[in-house]
């Protein structure tokens, strides 16, 4: 099964929007996907600046087969960058619900 990277807004949101990332991860795993959740990934403890976090996230994104987008991704500078890079690399990027519908069909 494909490995999906979860992209969505974090900055300025309560709890960095982590609950939405964890919900998406749970649903995508239940549908059979492997999931790379930047809210969970190791090695981000030392990331105190946005640039540091994005460097780590973009390295992870490059190892995935597609991107599962959370609501509000287009209003997030980081998530929009992740999706743009995914598309530029030829990876599929769709809302989480689209991946779930596709897996169910």
Spans of features found by a protein language model:
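Conserved catalytic or regulatory cores that recognize and/or transform ribose-phosphate-containing ligands
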Residues: 1-105
């Amino acid at each position: 099964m494909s490995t999906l990277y979860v992209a969505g807004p974090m900055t300025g949101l309560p709890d960095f929007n982590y609950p939405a990332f964890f919900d998406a991860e749970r649903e995508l795993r239940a549908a059979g996907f492997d999931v790379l959740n930047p809210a969970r990934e190791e090695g981000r403890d030392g990331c105190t600046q946005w640039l540091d976090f994005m460097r780590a996230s973009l390295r992870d994104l490059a190892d995935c087969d597609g991107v599962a987008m959370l609501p509000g991704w287009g209003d997030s500078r980081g998530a929009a960058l992740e999706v743009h890079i995914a598309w530029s690399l030829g990876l599929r990027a769709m809302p989480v619900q689209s991946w779930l519908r596709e897996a169910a069909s």
